[in-house]
């Protein structure tokens, strides 16, 4: 199997890809929000296995679906509708991950400015990822 992640395997099956036409495997979805769901579920799968892990998250606004669905799944982890989605994508037996132990690493180049400034990397991470 090319993908070892249960989430990735589930999305591969859903995409109905019979064979890869490139050297690098890929996943197909039918919409941009579905990419957000897929990336949020894969992140939560990884975070559940690496609660003290190191992560680097983009500050790009195009990741709004990732942020939205990550918060949605975490906030509604025990609700029936969410449980059905988690089960569908291989996370039915995964306990809700605790993200408080994750460490952020800056991946983009930012001009050094005070963390208290509204457009600082620190502020962007807090507003977009931590506070949601």
Regions found by a protein language model. Name each.
Residues 52-55, 82:
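Active-site pocket-lining segments that scaffold enzyme catalytic pockets across diverse folds
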Residues 29-42:
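A short, flexible low-complexity segment enriched in Lys/Arg and Gly/Pro that occurs
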Residues 62-65, 111-112:
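Short, active-site-adjacent cap segments at secondary-structure transitions
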Residues 1-27, 34, 84-132:
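Ligand-binding beta-strand-loop-alpha-helix segment within the catalytic cores
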Residues 64-81:
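Glycine-rich loop at the start of a catalytic domain that most often binds anionic cofactors/ligands
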Residues 39-53:
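Glycine-rich phosphate/diphosphate-binding loops that line cofactor/substrate pockets in enzymes
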Residues 56-62:
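Glycine-rich beta-strand-to-loop/alpha-helix junction loops that act as flexible
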């Amino acid at each position: 199997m090319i993908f070892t992640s249960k989430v990735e395997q589930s999305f591969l099956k859903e995409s109905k890809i019979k064979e890869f036409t490139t050297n690098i495997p890929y996943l197909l979805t039918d919409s941009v929000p579905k990419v957000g769901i897929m990336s949020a579920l894969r992140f939560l799968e990884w975070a559940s296995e690496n609660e003290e892990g190191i992560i680097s998250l983009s500050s790009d606004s195009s990741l709004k679906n990732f942020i939205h669905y990550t918060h949605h799944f975490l906030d509604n982890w025990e609700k029936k509708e969410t449980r059905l989605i988690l089960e569908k994508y291989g996370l039915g037996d995964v306990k809700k991950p605790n993200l408080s132990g994750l460490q952020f690493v800056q991946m983009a180049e930012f001009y050094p400015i005070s963390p208290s400034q509204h457009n600082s990397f620190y502020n962007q991470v807090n507003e977009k990822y931590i506070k949601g």
